[in-house]
């Protein structure tokens, strides 16, 4: 019989590739339509991800991000295909990495 003191699996560490997560709760991609009209992520994305990545060993998967202009189809969804978009994502990453969580980008194609 399991001890009542045993940590539930959800809150136990797990190794995913080279990364060890401190728990198994992952922020799934939530496309929030908050980028600028030019599909450039703004400061609100940096704030959003740094808040949610504040617990060490957390994993965040960013909102859906267009890989090209032709792959898009929705307004205010961030892209990662122009210099301005890439620079903005770098800013988001710098702010996010001040927090101890990990993040990956969810790439999206709408055809």
Ranges and model annotations:
Residues 1-111:
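Flavin-dependent oxidoreductase catalytic cores
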